[in-house]
Amino acid sequence: MAAKTYRLGVDVGGTHTDLVLLDVAGGTLAVEKVATTPKNPALGIMRGIGNFAARGVDLSGIEFFSHGTTITTNALLEMRGAKVGLLINRGFRAIQETQGQARDGNVFDYFFQKPPPIAPQSLTREIGGRIDYAGAVLEPLDEDAVRRAAAELKAAGVVSIAVCYLFAFMNPAHEERTGAIIREIFPDAHISLSSEVLSRVREWPRMSATLLNAYLAPVLATYITDLETRLNASGVTTQQRFLMQSNGGVMPFAAAVTGHKTVHSLLSGPAAGARASAYLPRDDGGAGGRGIVTLDMGGTSCDIAFIEGGAPLEVTEGIVARRQLDVPALDLTTISAGGGSIVWIDRAGFLSVGPQSAGADPGPVCYGRGGDNPTVTDADIVCGLLNPDYFLGGTQKLDAAAARAALETKIATPMKMTLAEAAAGIRLRIKAVGEQKPTTITNEADNLWTTSKAGK
């Protein structure tokens, strides 16, 4: 009898890590859900894989491994990236300060401030050399300036270097030579060339993507290297290991380690759900051709996507964590409505849900891990929507009394409500949170519905 072969998909969220194992020959699925380990998500993944092994799965039979993660997203949101230096054409160091005209949020905000530069002026170096709009060399690269810059940035403690020259997307020769020189002087540096990260017209969007790539590349490389070591040690030795990209495609782990396309993983987790949802209606008699709205709710947020003609809608421009990111991605709208979303009373005395989340650590009050802020999950227990004795398939017991006490103390009593009214109010508030972006969601859904009807 031939040994079984499997395909494993792993999605690491802010609260839980989900693993789905497909028996290729039998077509059966096995599922594991474990708590995410925020300090090192690889630990949660290996716990889930260990659970499969305990159920009799031969881990050496896993022939394909696909991974959706928020590791780079969280690093950007929390500003936990690497120390970055920037090399740019002589006379253009102010580009990172001026940026573009795009604003996130309220365009009428008189006090709007652009996010601080990833590579400050003290770590920015101007390099002689120019390439024109057609790709012709107007001025040769000043290689001595590159050597001086690399040595100075190394001495300053820089870990990652971004290189962004004018019209490099037409002729990458100067950037490529710069990268080679940096490797001679500073072999341990992570190097991001704009011609590799985002080879397209528009100076600031290309620079922004390159800087973000340089900022996050060491974070992702360290994580993937550690995960690969743990996978090999566990017996998962397949080399078919892939990381989900923002556009719903995949990149090999090797590409994630080299760091040329790190920035394409910023929406890795949500993209996987939207891409998978596009396949679900294809066998229902033609629904795949109609407009579909998908909702992917986890412990921290809810991601909304639109599917038309059997494929998710895509965009090539966007803003992530207040920073411009013009890379191909699925068109996703995120709202702060998840099981771990914290419930609180604002200064006006109104009930609010999120955007803060209790995450996996400490988690909701009912987890009993030191969390003292009531969450949607705690309200669900009070409403009777969750069985505290059978959470995560019965592997985790929830403290219903602690959930009630937290809601009573922090929500019901201050708002002069009964406990039941407070819990029900939280459920209603989640609906309101889901309407925070009604214009975008409604308009796009209406367009899909109109298109679908016209195509019948």
Regions found by a protein language model. Name each.
Residues 1-456:
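N-terminally biased helix-coil "hinge/interface" segments that flank
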